[in-house]
Amino acid sequence: MGSLDPLAWRLADGDPDAPRELVERHHIELYRYARALLRDAPAAEDAVQETFERAFVALGKYPEERIETLSLRPWLYRITLNVVRNAWRQRRREVPMAETPERTDERFWTVPGSVSGADYKEAWMDALEALGRLSERQRVAVALRYLEDLPYAEIAETTGWPENTCKTLVRRGIGRLGALLSDAPDGKGDR
């Protein structure tokens, strides 16, 4: 499913403007993804920075054949997922999803095509707390599908899981989220 992304070629060829363009194009979406999984703004920022560092190094070493088939966006999400998993291992525990994200971190609340506001943030807070109660695989699949709006083919490419597995994980994860949110103790479970 590779696509010829001219930016990948420019990065591999050492174009001095290409790294800035890559960061501008993908920073917010990768930050939002890492932030949803790590639940820690500084750790998410570190994860995204490490993602870009790894990407720049790898592209400089890849053979031409690899660059020809590289789908840049799923590849960056996969690097981010690997960096996040390393952070989880370093913590020697599951993702601390009981913590709540800072309400002032506007990048986290910026979702393409959405409206902002207190109701939106509150609904996301509830959803993200419930997201933390999913299995790691369901959490990753649901975040990629609904937080980052990736198609199933890109989720499969990002995670290395079969596309049907991704669909199943998302379906089961959404079902579990629905059950968790409908049982919300504050009466807000019907969102």
Predicted regions and their residues:
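Short, basic/polar amphipathic helix motif occurring as a linker/hinge flanking DNA-binding modules
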Residues: 86-111, 118, 187-190
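N-terminal module of bacterial RNA polymerase sigma factors
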Residues: 1-29, 36, 129-132, 154, ...
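Short, charged helix-capping/linker segments at alpha-helix termini
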Residues: 12-21, 31-50, 64-66, 163, ...
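Amphipathic, Lys/Arg- and hydrophobic-enriched alpha-helical face
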Residues: 23-41, 58-61, 131, 176-183
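DNA-recognition helix of helix-turn-helix
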Residues: 81, 85, 124-130, 138, ...
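Arg/Lys-rich amphipathic alpha helix in sigma70-family domain 2
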Residues: 57-64, 77-99, 120, 178
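Structural recognition of an alpha-helix C-terminal capping motif at a helix-to-coil junction
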Residues: 46-53, 70-82
